[in-house]
């Protein structure tokens, strides 16, 4: 994105944003590169402008824009100006190639401007701006029109929220915006000179800046809005724009659900091997496991342990979709089974947060056997010991997890807009040669069909679980 200032007599408070378009209340100053380039062409440009009429300032220069919106203002490189003596000049500049030209022979440009404005209707082309009825009558309206176009363009084309346009007090947002714009101004030197359309150039470079700073933002899967990652966790990974429930890591879910200082993990040292010596042309299975362990800091796709939820002791397993898509291998099945057996022995309520793509194909039939093993342990926990199990289905919950412990709860809870299915839409359509309707695998649609009991947003989830446990005679330890 080219970083530059356009100073003009728009009589409006200066503002700066990612497009770096600002307006000065004092003068039509030099059009310059914000990176303070030492290019001699730029220096010559400043001198040429300052030589007009022998003045050092431009408070008496009137600036005309024959435009209907800001898109034309930005894309048009030719401007029509009138100095204090009534002489009219045309300015042409090309920031990419450092070209600046001044011409006072402009009959076609001037006549085109008069034809497209109400100036012709007034029948006045006075050389003296003090007696020009067009200037006196319409200057305020024209300035407001340009300002309105600028505000509209910034909001619609550059996706800047209205509170940013009006000047936000959020210093962190301003700092981020200025940092991004500062970097983009330097990186603009590498833009392709063959790209002539500034709107296209702006859009492509804006995308590059977004990609460059993607470690600062989380993009919503629903509305594609950007959420600042620093505050994203405190908002429970909910989109600030549309409220969509985005994916959470297992560690964040544990922090959300379990009381601080009460989490005790189980079987952390259990890791996967390569039981069937699965070989892939892309990457060996063992190398993939090592890669995900380094990436996520986890040993497997599930964390299990015990903790307190509003003072109530619970056993909880949380699957992590970031680790190989939350796929269920032999280690995942073994850790969940051991947790269920521990909860059975200690008479603890059980929570399993599901986020999985299904059984792990790299372990073959061993991964499929985990479905039966976990279901068998749950049968003893629920039917024989009469204990309380709550699965929480998050997005996505598919495959073998849906076909086993995901749907065996006493009370089944789903998150809003969660993707819940046995087979994915693409697999069904290719296998059955039938079209799967959009939304037919969403939590809201499946709730109407009776697949689970509750759809609970993240904000009240902990209190809902606490009430369910107390309803089933599980009470806080410190309660009298």
Swiss-Prot record:
UniProt-listed Gene3D superfamilies: 2-enoyl-CoA Hydratase, Chain A, domain 1
Metabolic or biological pathway: Lipid metabolism; malonyl-CoA biosynthesis; malonyl-CoA from acetyl-CoA: step 1/1
Cofactor: Zn(2+)
Renumbered residue ranges of the record's region Disordered: 25-48
Compartment(s) where it occurs, according to its Swiss-Prot or TrEMBL record: Plastid, Chloroplast stroma
EC number: 2.1.3.15
UniProt: Zn(2+) binding residues: 220, 223, 239, 242
SUPFAM superfamilies (UniProt xref): ClpP/crotonase
Note describing how the cofactor binds: Binds 1 zinc ion per subunit.
Catalytic function, reaction form: N(6)-carboxybiotinyl-L-lysyl-[protein] + acetyl-CoA = N(6)-biotinyl-L-lysyl-[protein] + malonyl-CoA
Zinc-finger keyword on record: yes
Domain CoA carboxyltransferase N-terminal, residue spans: 216-480
Keywords: ATP-binding, Chloroplast, Fatty acid biosynthesis, Fatty acid metabolism, Lipid biosynthesis, Lipid metabolism, Metal-binding, Nucleotide-binding, Plastid, Transferase, Zinc, Zinc-finger
Mapped zinc finger ranges (C4-type): 220-242
Residue spans of biased composition, Basic and acidic residues class: 35-47
Gene Ontology BP, a term: malonyl-CoA biosynthetic process
PROSITE patterns, per the entry: COA_CT_NTER (PS50980)
GO molecular function, one term: carboxyl- or carbamoyltransferase activity
GO cellular component: acetyl-CoA carboxylase complex; chloroplast stroma
Annotated S-S bridges: none
Family, similarity comment: Belongs to the AccD/PCCB family.
Function comment: Component of the acetyl coenzyme A carboxylase (ACC) complex. Biotin carboxylase (BC) catalyzes the carboxylation of biotin on its carrier protein (BCCP) and then the CO(2) group is transferred by the transcarboxylase to acetyl-CoA to form malonyl-CoA.
Subunit architecture: Acetyl-CoA carboxylase is a heterohexamer composed of biotin carboxyl carrier protein, biotin carboxylase and 2 subunits each of ACCase subunit alpha and ACCase plastid-coded subunit beta (accD).
Protein name per UniProt: Acetyl-coenzyme A carboxylase carboxyl transferase subunit beta, chloroplastic
UniProt organism field: Helianthus annuus
């Amino acid at each position: 994105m080219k970083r530059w200032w356009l100073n003009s007599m728009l009589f409006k408070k200066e503002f700066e944003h990612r497009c770096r378009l600002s307006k000065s209340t004092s003068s039509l100053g030099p059009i310059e590169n914000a990176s303070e380039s030492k290019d001699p062409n730029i220096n010559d440009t400043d001198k040429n402008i300052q030589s007009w009429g022998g003045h050092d300032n431009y408070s008496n220069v009137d600036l005309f824009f024959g435009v209907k919106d800001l898109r034309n203002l930005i894309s048009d490189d030719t401007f029509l100006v009138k100095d204090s003596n009534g002489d009219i000049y045309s300015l042409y500049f090309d920031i990419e190639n450092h070209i600046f030209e001044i011409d006072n022979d402009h009959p076609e440009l001037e006549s085109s401007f008069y034809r497209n404005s109400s100036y012709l209707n007034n029948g006045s082309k006075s050389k003296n701006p003090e007696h020009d009825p067009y200037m006196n009558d319409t200057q305020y309206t024209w300035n407001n029109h340009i300002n309105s176009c600028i505000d509209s363009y910034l909001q619609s084309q550059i996706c800047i929220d209205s509170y940013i346009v009006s000047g936000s007090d959020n210093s962190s947002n301003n700092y981020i915006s200025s940092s991004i714009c500062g970097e983009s101004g330097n990186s603009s030197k590498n833009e392709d000179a063959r790209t002539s359309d500034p709107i296209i150039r702006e859009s492509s470079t804006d995308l590059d800046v977004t990609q460059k700073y993607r470690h600062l933002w989380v993009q919503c899967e629903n509305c594609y809005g950007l959420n600042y990652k620093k505050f994203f966790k405190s908002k429970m990974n909910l989109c600030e724009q549309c409220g969509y429930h985005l994916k959470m890591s297992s560690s964040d879910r544990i922090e959300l659900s379990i009381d601080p200082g009460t989490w005790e993990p189980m079987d952390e040292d259990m890791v996967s091997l390569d039981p069937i010596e699965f070989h892939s042309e892309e990457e060996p299975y063992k190398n993939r496991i090592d890669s995900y362990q380094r990436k996520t800091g986890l040993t497997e796709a599930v964390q299990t342990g015990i903790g307190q939820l509003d003072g109530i002791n619970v056993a909880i397993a949380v699957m992590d979709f970031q680790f190989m898509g939350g796929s269920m291998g032999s280690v995942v099945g073994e850790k969940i089974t051991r947790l269920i057996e521990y909860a059975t022995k200690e008479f603890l309520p059980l929570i399993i947060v599901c986020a999985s793509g299904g059984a792990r194909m790299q372990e073959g039939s061993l991964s499929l056997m985990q479905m039966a093993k976990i279901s068998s342990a749950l049968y003893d926990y629920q039917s024989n010991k009469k204990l309380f199990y709550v699965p929480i289905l998050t997005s996505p919950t598919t495959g073998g997890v849906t076909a086993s412990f995901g749907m065996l709860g006493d009370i089944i809870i789903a998150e809003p807009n969660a993707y819940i299915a046995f087979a994915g839409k693409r697999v069904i359509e290719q296998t059955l040669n039938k079209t799967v309707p959009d939304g037919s695998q969403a939590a809201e649609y499946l709730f109407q069909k009776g697949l689970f009991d509750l759809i609970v947003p993240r904000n009240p989830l902990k209190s809902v679980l606490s009430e369910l446990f107390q309803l089933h005679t599980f009470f806080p330890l410190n309660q009298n």
